[in-house]
Design a protein with these regions (language model features):
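Catalytic machinery of carbohydrate-active enzymes
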Residues: 1-327
């Protein structure tokens, strides 16, 4: 059985498809191919459950022509937009997708009417694949490193399980932990802090934080690769993050996760996920204006950004200390 799984982007969304790849490979003895964007192929190419990766080309027709030569038995569309639908239809084989719940999300964002099911997106993937008769009881996520991968933590004065990661960035400003909150957290935490992120704005923000915190902070923003960042997370004593791709990568590792929610909401079903929900803490300020966006924006629509600025720093630090003591 030859199967094409489609998910174009982004970091977290692709990591969230990892249980699907395992179910197909281990139970259906399927030859699993994956269609994604070039920027994200490193998230898939080291996965032993994926035999071949195709990259989305500028012209969708070129992508389709390339894929047609494979003769797929099944397409599983986990992106479900116009381009992925066009690819799926053109391949003329069995097709499975899932309900993105966009109307319900729209109601929640625009009218604060929450009729979303209390289900994680991985649970919805499992339901969509019921027709294949798969055993989906193991819904744990996976992140795979390259063969013979090595990263020297000591080069950055980091010792395994003796530091906490803080993710300072995010795709949108309203999903990011503000500088003032990060500084308050670092001031109260006793452990060394490994700062993670990417992009020019994250770099500027990280420099400002580093200048105020001294040697306690190890600034890794824009200094290491995504794979290296994943390794730093895996070896940490825990991670403090907002709704980011690195949050989902952390879900694949046995470490405490502390997620601060900004404009988005865990009820969208995209929170940090483990089968037994161990050591996952969500911090969501109860505001009438939240969520204000499904994805995020450059500015708070009400100009107060209280969803982040009103986070209970003392509670977050207390929870970090309790999980650290338990290790």
């Amino acid at each position: 059985m030859k199967v094409l799984v489609i998910r174009f982007s982004s970091i977290g969304d692709i990591v969230l498809t990892s249980p699907v790849l395992r179910w197909l490979s281990t139970q259906k003895n399927a030859e699993v191919h994956y269609l994604t964007k070039q920027a994200y192929d490193s998230l898939v190419k080291h996965n032993p459950h994926v035999q071949k990766i195709y990259l989305l080309q500028d012209e969708i027709a070129d992508t389709i022509n390339e894929l047609k030569e494979e003769g797929y038995d099944l397409v599983i569309d986990l992106h479900k937009n116009l381009r992925s639908k066009k690819v799926s239809k053109a391949l003329n084989c069995e097709y499975i997708t899932f309900n993105k719940l966009n109307i319900r999300k729209w109601l929640f964002v625009n009218f604060k009417i929450n009729v979303l099911p209390k289900k994680h997106i991985i649970d919805r993937y499992a339901e969509a694949l019921d027709v294949l008769g798969l055993d989906t009881a193991d819904r744990s996520m996976e992140y795979h490193f390259p063969h013979q991968y090595a990263f020297d933590l000591t080069a950055y004065n980091l010792k395994p399980k003796h530091y906490i990661c803080i993710v300072i960035g995010g795709t949108y400003t309203t999903k990011q932990i503000p500088e003032s909150i990060i500084l308050s957290l670092i001031k109260r935490l006793k452990q060394p802090i490994a700062m993670l992120g990417g992009g020019k704005q994250d770099e500027i923000k990280a420099q400002k934080i580093s200048e105020q915190c001294g040697s306690q902070v190890i600034n890794l923003v824009n200094k290491i690769s995504l794979i290296d960042s994943a390794y730093v997370i895996q070896k940490s004593a825990g991670i403090i993050t907002s709704d980011t791709g690195l949050m989902h990568i952390a879900s694949a590792f046995d470490i405490p996760i502390h997620t601060l929610w900004g404009n988005t909401h865990p009820d969208f079903g995209m929170y940090a996920y483990r089968v037994h929900n161990t050591e996952i803490n969500n911090y969501n300020v109860n505001l009438k204006c939240q969520p204000c966006s499904k994805l995020g924006s450059d500015l708070c629509p009400r100009a107060h950004f209280s969803c982040m600025l009103n986070q209970n720093v003392e509670q977050i630090v207390k929870n970090c200390e309790s999980t650290d003591a338990a290790q």
